[in-house]
Amino acid sequence: MNIFFVSLGCDKNLVDSEVMLGLLDAKGYQIVDDETQADVMVINTCCFIHDAKEESIQTILDMARYKEEGRLKALVVTGCLAQRYKQEIIDEIPEVDVVLGTTSYDKIVEAVEEALEGKSEVELADINALPLPETKRLVTTGGHYAYLKIAEGCDKHCTYCIIPKVRGNYRSVPMERLIKEAQELTDQGVKELILVAQETTVYGQDIYGEKSLHKLLKELCQIKGIRWIRLLYCYPEEIDDNLIQVMKEEPKICHYLDLPIQHASDAILKKMGRRTSKQQLIDTITKLRKEIPDIALRTTLITGFPGETQEQHEEVMEFVDEMEFERLGVFTYSPEEDTPAATMPDQIDEEVKEDRQADIMELQQEIVFDQAEDMIGKEVLVMIEGKVADENAYVGRTYRDAPNVDGLIFVNTDEELMTGDFAKVKVTGAAEYDLIGELI
């Protein structure tokens, strides 16, 4: 029986998809890359912002066409959109057989079997459950790097965010389970572990009574075969001395942190429900750069939040200019139903949001270009991602670059390299957000 799987949304959702793929593969289902060859389709959806919701809905409708035409035996929808709009999906898209919530993905085999039997089901476990199936994940990221989801859910309840409603409260995965999963990934050839959660920095607080990310990192560093460990989704107010110290001590931990700050105006941060201030952000970033001089900092910002004035936008611009983040992404504010921010007064016009987004990205581009110029002549360690077609060159990443969201380095060489290899490269040039180098 052939299954075509679509995974939408974030890297945390991708981990759920890989767990489901592992369960289906272990049960004997054949995973196919061609949707026209599928007997069953599974769509793992996202609904974090409006565009993600639209993409999920359109994907379901596109795949439902195969069911309507009789070319597909079963269609299963899971993930955040399924959790949030479970009954609407079943009622309005009759081609969908089974809807699985965000904490029911461990029931994917049963869901597929029910769908093949012609049943129409909505399967929702307790939103605060923490499914931990024993079956190994089917890694889809190429085999040389993988995401390790260390927790589920979120307790922050930012005013613009729907995540607690679709993912539940914060639940840390027990450390021994994560060590086991990391070892299994390494046994499959993974060399870079990327730790993810809605928030990684409070890992362990709920089950161990204290923040334990630094302890988890120490344990992961003991696993042979792991070369890099990277941290994403680190809330700046939760960065502490224990985390900084372990980053300084353990050579496997990339000197890279993803710090989603969202804004730099105290008034907007308060309206967002963020638990920090502009000065606290400055203090944290300053301390990180002092303690770990070669650290690369990534952040994300939201522009056009309700009530954001031109002066507050300019305050963000000044902050970005002063902090000189190595990596930065900007989202325009997306009002999500059932969130406090969606009903706040003074909603901003889309054109204004987009203009402000462009302002920030233009400034950031100048910062990144200057930083890239400073890299010329330096030697860097590169993880090879693949070969450039029809050229004596490869593409890879430095410790400063997370996959899919950051830049790349193009490596010129006549030597043969393999995906996942580590190579020493001398930077010889820069091209927008990417670097160019030669194998040493």
Segments from the language model and where they lie:
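Short glycine-enriched, charge-decorated loop/helix-capping segments at active-site entrances
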Residues: 47-48, 167-168, 207-210, 270-276, ...
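Short, hinge-like loop/turn segments at secondary-structure boundaries
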Residues: 93-94, 115-118, 211-213, 247-248, ...
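Active-site proximal loops enriched in glycine and acidic residues that flank catalytic Cys/His/Asp
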Residues: 197, 233, 261-263, 299-303, ...
